[in-house]
Swiss-Prot record:
<keyword id="KW-0963">Cytoplasm</keyword>
<dbReference type="Pfam" id="PF01330">
    <property type="entry name" value="RuvA_N"/>
</dbReference>
<dbReference type="InterPro" id="IPR013849">
    <property type="entry name" value="DNA_helicase_Holl-junc_RuvA_I"/>
</dbReference>
<dbReference type="GO" id="GO:0006310">
    <property type="term" value="P:DNA recombination"/>
</dbReference>
<dbReference type="InterPro" id="IPR011114">
    <property type="entry name" value="RuvA_C"/>
</dbReference>
<comment type="similarity">
    <text>Belongs to the RuvA family.</text>
</comment>
<dbReference type="GO" id="GO:0005524">
    <property type="term" value="F:ATP binding"/>
</dbReference>
<feature type="region of interest" description="Flexible linker">
    <location>
        <begin position="142"/>
        <end position="146"/>
    </location>
</feature>
<dbReference type="InterPro" id="IPR012340">
    <property type="entry name" value="NA-bd_OB-fold"/>
</dbReference>
<dbReference type="InterPro" id="IPR000085">
    <property type="entry name" value="RuvA"/>
</dbReference>
<keyword id="KW-0234">DNA repair</keyword>
<dbReference type="Pfam" id="PF14520">
    <property type="entry name" value="HHH_5"/>
</dbReference>
<dbReference type="GO" id="GO:0009379">
    <property type="term" value="C:Holliday junction helicase complex"/>
</dbReference>
<dbReference type="Pfam" id="PF07499">
    <property type="entry name" value="RuvA_C"/>
</dbReference>
<comment type="function">
    <text>The RuvA-RuvB-RuvC complex processes Holliday junction (HJ) DNA during genetic recombination and DNA repair, while the RuvA-RuvB complex plays an important role in the rescue of blocked DNA replication forks via replication fork reversal (RFR). RuvA specifically binds to HJ cruciform DNA, conferring on it an open structure. The RuvB hexamer acts as an ATP-dependent pump, pulling dsDNA into and through the RuvAB complex. HJ branch migration allows RuvC to scan DNA until it finds its consensus sequence, where it cleaves and resolves the cruciform DNA.</text>
</comment>
<dbReference type="GO" id="GO:0005737">
    <property type="term" value="C:cytoplasm"/>
</dbReference>
<feature type="region of interest" description="Domain III">
    <location>
        <begin position="147"/>
        <end position="200"/>
    </location>
</feature>
Length: 200
């Protein structure tokens, strides 16, 4: 099992980064906030979780152990897999997620694409007593510029990948870019996620 990866950041996309360690490039899936804290050409270290399936082995990266533990905890809920767990961490930062679960805040949880009212209620019931076991040690991860290409297209693609309908993703992206046309891809993506969360 690969518990962490440290090395030079070779590539940063909207849903993953490639980090070279000992001559091997590891593709690590991560949230926009985590990816925004990386910089191409510099050394980085991510705590990782490896998900092994019959036809794939996928690495998920996190800035700290707390986020990784929450990722694992979310998957103990029936119907929540790695993709939905990552979408949850993309919309709700660890402290906000812990608070939502501890307080039974179903509204906050349903901001995540793919989580309806019943799913949110199930998460609260199953995880409310477990979130206290997960520490609260991390700070916010700073955001940075993303890769090339059309910023709008990259953001829409990332939002659709997280489970938002294409039309909603396009509307949120257009709204964010109209207000702040000079935004970097990462900051615009965070703003679009925030906007979509409020309108759900």
């Amino acid at each position: 099992m690969i518990a962490s990866v440290r090395g030079e950041v070779l590539e940063i996309a909207l849903d993953h980064a490639v980090i070279e360690s000992a001559g091997v490039g590891y593709r690590v899936n991560a949230t926009p906030a985590t990816l925004g804290g990386l910089q191409r050409g510099t050394e980085a270290r991510l705590v990782t979780a490896m998900i092994v399936r019959e036809d794939s082995m996928t690495l998920y990266g996190f800035p700290d152990s707390e986020s990784k533990e929450l990722f694992g905890l979310l998957q103990t809920v029936s119907g929540v897999g790695p993709r939905l767990a990552m979408a949850t961490l993309a919309v709700l930062e660890p402290e906000a997620l812990r608070s939502a679960l501890a307080e039974g805040n179903v509204t906050a949880l349903t901001r995540v694409p793919g989580i309806g009212k019943r799913g949110a209620e199930r998460m609260v019931v199953e995880l409310r007593d477990k979130v206290d076991a997960v520490g609260s040690t991390s700070g916010a991860v700073p955001l940075g510029a993303g890769g090339g290409g059309s910023v709008r297209d990259q953001i829409v693609e990332a939002l659709v990948g997280l489970g938002f309908p294409a039309k909603q993703a396009e509307q949120a992206t257009d709204s964010v870019l109209a207000e702040a046309p000079e935004s970097t891809t990462s900051s615009a993506l965070r703003s679009a996620l925030s906007l979509l969360g409020k309108t759900r």
